[in-house]
Amino acid sequence: DVERSRGLGDVYKRQALSEVSEVKIGLIPLEVDGFYSPQDNCIFINANLHGADLIHTLIHEVTHSKLHTKSEAIFGDKQYTLQELEAESTAYIVANNYDIDTSKYTMGYLNSWGLDKISNEELQGVMENIQKTARGLIEKIDLELEKRKNLEPTKSKLQTEIQEAKKEQKELLKKHEEKTKKET
């Protein structure tokens, strides 16, 4: 039951992130966990990711989609490094807010970008952006999660049609029985 409720929690978090994201999200087989394409204005996530890894990657890419839409940074340059710092640090804070521990991955990921080459002034500007973005995402995600909190699982269209057909069938059967009683 705990795993099932955790799974439902993950589903609600994914749905909330989809609502918070202002760009389309596509799940496709990838060699990487995910990426945001400013040209397509779309987030692509590896279809093989699940649970906390999927949510963490979604947060990271949603952050890119909110902060770096007009980016002309080139892989490996200082601007790209700063953008990765913003996205990963924001993802860490937001994920941590929802009891998803990404510290092992996050610390290694950030170190791989050579953050020791960033000046204190650059770091200060990035940190302000990270805090503001994380706070905004958490507020929006919380609103979306609150909407889902009291919702009953929705029935599919087919389930609704079957239920209506059964009801109609009962009514017809009842009318038929009443008609048969009157005739006898």
Label each residue range with its predicted role.
Residues 55, 59, 83-86, 126, ...:
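Hydrophobic (often cysteine-bearing) scaffold residues that line and stabilize catalytic clefts
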Residues 95-158:
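Long, well-structured alpha-helical subdomains associated
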Residues 13-40:
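Catalytic zinc-binding patch centered on the HExxH motif and its immediate surroundings
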Residues 43-58, 77-78:
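Short pre-active-site segment immediately N-terminal to the catalytic Zn-binding motif
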Residues 160, 164-170, 174, 178-184:
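Non-Sec secretion/translocation targeting segments of pathogen effectors
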Residues 56-72, 87:
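Active-site recognition of the HExxH zinc-binding catalytic motif
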Residues 82-97:
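An active-site-proximal "capping" alpha-helix that borders the catalytic cofactor pocket
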Residues 1-12:
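Single conserved hydrophobic/aromatic residue that forms the stacking wall/gate
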